[in-house]
């Protein structure tokens, strides 16, 4: 067996820092004297929540392809050096009792290496798409209202859904090229928690487990965010910062027909972004 290191997943971090700084500046009306909670209260029972974000994920684990065992140990700064494109976001539709959501990440990296006087090009694409639904089974009022004019609460919501993952690799050398890919879909079940810590601050956390040998052997997703309610461009907005982990253990026959493709990798790192309510 031969062991090597690979790189795979977010130049966007700098843009994100700038975006977050602009968000803070745009939230100047967040001072108590200027913030109109009644105006911020939703006029409809249904709310659409749009949440762009950046996940500065590092990768740690093992992978196998064509009889080669690969040690996956990629800090985010290495990914950033080879990053071409990163798109990440979440959209949720809820009436407060139940709702649906869509979450997606697409990351593309590229790099060139020298091997035996030949230049080898490696392009890697990773796509993760999740769709799910949730239902609120518990809600406890905590007293007072949020900055958006709604009662402060603690709520718990079971969730169920599907998560699709696709890995693509394009290799080029001496004018020749080859492309290989693998994809799988995992069902998952989990819990979401939302706690209004104060008028402006809130904490959200979510954890789910899936795979069950339907797609991967096992997948675990966990994330938690501290949020601050404010206003951006006239819309109620929550600035968020937190941490996320996604572990996947997937195995299938690879393109050789005699070896296994294995992806036993943990992605983890800080997340920063915002949620705008409509």
Language model feature labels by segment:
Residues 44-46, 83-87, 125-129, 154, ...:
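Residues that define the transmembrane beta-barrel architecture of outer-membrane proteins
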Residues 33-100:
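Short glycine/proline- and aromatic-enriched beta-strand/turn motifs that initiate or cap beta-hairpins
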